């Protein structure tokens, strides 16, 4: 009997998911991860699928496109979503996780699988033979980047993502902080640091004049809106933050009974509830400046920072030119790409791309027909976008209902439209899974 083998480069969210989907279909996997031999910027552990930005996988409800994407992944036996469901922490209407428990679970699951061989070493060249999934992520090493550039024949597009700081609960002044979720939704999942106008103006002035960490001159900064450094956002105008991460809508300061001028929210970062991250505070400020500037936030005057914010490169290919909706290269169909390097944006989207690449690589290994997900599903809509979008200004994309085909009926409310989109998607996905016998690939 012929042994089917697939090489997966990178054990981030996409690579881990791809390896899992392959192994559960009887495919032997060689999974390569350069950590701990070599650490890219922003990574702190050797665990697979380390979350280097937020610990939130965003909205849980299926009326939201990313909530639907997660539910579709559950139907497809996603390892990443299983790990998230097993390690969730309170986060209102979002699915947030204990980041260490989440990554450890994924690592141990893959290490224990008899069909997965783990190689803790850097890959500098794409194998010349065999099926390969490149899931090296937004922090692809320089040597592998050069190799990918050779294979794709395309120049890289790149920008920076920025991670938010994490503080300890016990170091906060809870006389100034209150627990609540906006509009009272879900549990009182967030710590809220209210600011009056004077406090906000002092904080804003310190922020826009703070010293930033240096960036190499040859690297042009192009920020994705979903992970915009807070100081860059602030530089757009004095009130910009009040309509972004510091928006006070839906919150009432119990000390005054009124809506604050601005609010900084902190979200639980671990299962024990001892660590909290500053929501929307991705930053590239120098560490000393972060300590100084963020102490202007009420309640954080003496905060203990267990992790300062960092900024890191995010590299992605021009997928509309290079990839099929199966995530195979058009010119080299034995090579798949998956994760953020394809131009999807977000943890869940990256894992979903890994899921698709894994299923299709298994099909290719078994000489079966490869699959293109229906465009009415979140998976299909996202893959359709990244492989057919205009190449003139191709930008990373989160999943959104704007990518889906229009509904045949007109509904007024956003929530009602989202619910209808989700119900249609899940019904079509269920029928498609049965028709294509995905579990039998």
Swiss-Prot record:
NCBIfam families: gid_trmFO, PRK05335.1. Catalyzes the folate-dependent formation of 5-methyl-uridine at position 54 (M-5-U54) in all tRNAs. Its EC number is 2.1.1.74. This is Methylenetetrahydrofolate--tRNA-(uracil-5-)-methyltransferase TrmFO. Its cofactor is FAD. HAMAP family: TrmFO. It comes from the Bacteria. Belongs to the MnmG family. TrmFO subfamily. It comes from Desulforamulus reducens (strain ATCC BAA-1160 / DSM 100696 / MI-1). The gene is trmFO. It is found in: Cytoplasm. One of its GO terms (cellular component) is cytosol.
């Amino acid at each position: 009997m012929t042994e089917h083998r697939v090489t997966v480069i990178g054990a981030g969210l996409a690579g881990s998911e791809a390896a899992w989907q392959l192994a559960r279909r009887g495919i032997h996997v060689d999974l390569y991860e350069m950590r701990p031999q070599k650490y890219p910027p922003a990574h702190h552990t050797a665990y697979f699928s380390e979350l280097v930005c937020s610990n939130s996988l965003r909205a849980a409800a299926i009326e939201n496109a990313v909530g639907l994407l997660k539910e579709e992944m559950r139907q497809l036996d996603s390892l990443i979503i299983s790990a998230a469901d097993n390690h969730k922490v309170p986060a209102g209407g979002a699915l947030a996780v204990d980041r260490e428990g989440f990554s450890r679970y994924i690592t141990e699951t893959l290490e224990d699988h008899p069909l997965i061989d783990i190689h803790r070493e850097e890959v500098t060249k794409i194998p010349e033979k065999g099926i390969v999934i490149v899931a090296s992520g937004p922090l692809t090493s320089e040597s592998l980047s050069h190799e990918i550039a050779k294979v794709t024949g395309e120049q890289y597009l790149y920008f920076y993502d920025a991670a938010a700081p994490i503080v300890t609960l016990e170091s906060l002044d809870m006389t100034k902080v209150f627990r609540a979720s906006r509009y009272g939704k879900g549990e009182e999942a967030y710590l809220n640091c209210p600011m009056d106008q004077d406090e906000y103006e002092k904080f804003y002035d310190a922020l826009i004049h703070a010293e930033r960490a240096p960036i190499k001159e040859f690297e042009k900064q192009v920020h994705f809106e979903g992970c915009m450094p807070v100081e860059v956002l602030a530089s757009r105008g004095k009130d910009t933050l009040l309509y972004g991460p510091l928006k006070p809508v839906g919150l009432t300061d119990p000390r005054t009974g009124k809506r604050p001028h601005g609010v900084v929210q902190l979200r639980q970062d671990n299962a024990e509830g001892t660590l909290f991250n500053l929501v929307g505070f991705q930053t590239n400020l120098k560490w000393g400046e972060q300590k100084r500037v963020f102490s202007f936030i009420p309640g954080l005057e003496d905060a203990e920072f267990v992790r300062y914010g960092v900024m890191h490169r995010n590299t992605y290919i021009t997928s509309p030119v290079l990839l099929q909706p199966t995530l195979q290269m058009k010119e080299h169909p034995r090579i798949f790409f998956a994760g953020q390097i394809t131009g999807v944006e977000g943890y869940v989207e990256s894992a979903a791309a890994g899921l698709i690449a894994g299923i299709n690589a298994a099909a290719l290994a078994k000489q079966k027909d490869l699959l293109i997900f229906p465009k009415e599903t979140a998976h299909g809509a996202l893959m359709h976008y990244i492989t057919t979008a205009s190449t003139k200004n191709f930008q990373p994309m989160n999943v959104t209902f704007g990518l889906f085909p229009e509904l045949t009926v007109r509904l007024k409310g956003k929530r009602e439209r989202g619910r209808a989109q989700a119900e249609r998607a899940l019904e079509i996905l269920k029928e498609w899974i049965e028709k294509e016998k995905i579990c039998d690939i």
